[in-house]
Amino acid sequence: PPTTFYGSSLTEGSIISDGCVVNDGAKIVDSVIGPCTVIAKNVELDGTVIVGRDEIMKRTQAEQDIGEGTVIRRCIVDSDAMIGANVRILNEAGVQNIDRSEDGYVISDGIVTILGGATIPDGFII
């Protein structure tokens, strides 16, 4: 199915694949969004690659790949990862390399990668 936009969203310099759902208030800049990704309200993505899902999953309204109010910059989100609400993935500390696989992410050359299948809880800050 085609991507569905609900409400008012801003997209600039981005590619959004088929089967996505983008909710009201989302801001997607210089990013690539893979298939079947559900983005909640008021999410900000900048310079982010979301691999997406291999297949469309039946979800309730509460189930989203990127939770409400989350801000992500310069990040790769591998397939089937789930990111909670009000998460901030900004690497404001400027960490260059760290392996936090047990927490579902690694940082390599300053780029945060959320590992495939990982779940990042609500309010988490990287």
Which residues are covered by each model-predicted region?
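Left-handed beta-helix
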Residues: 1-126
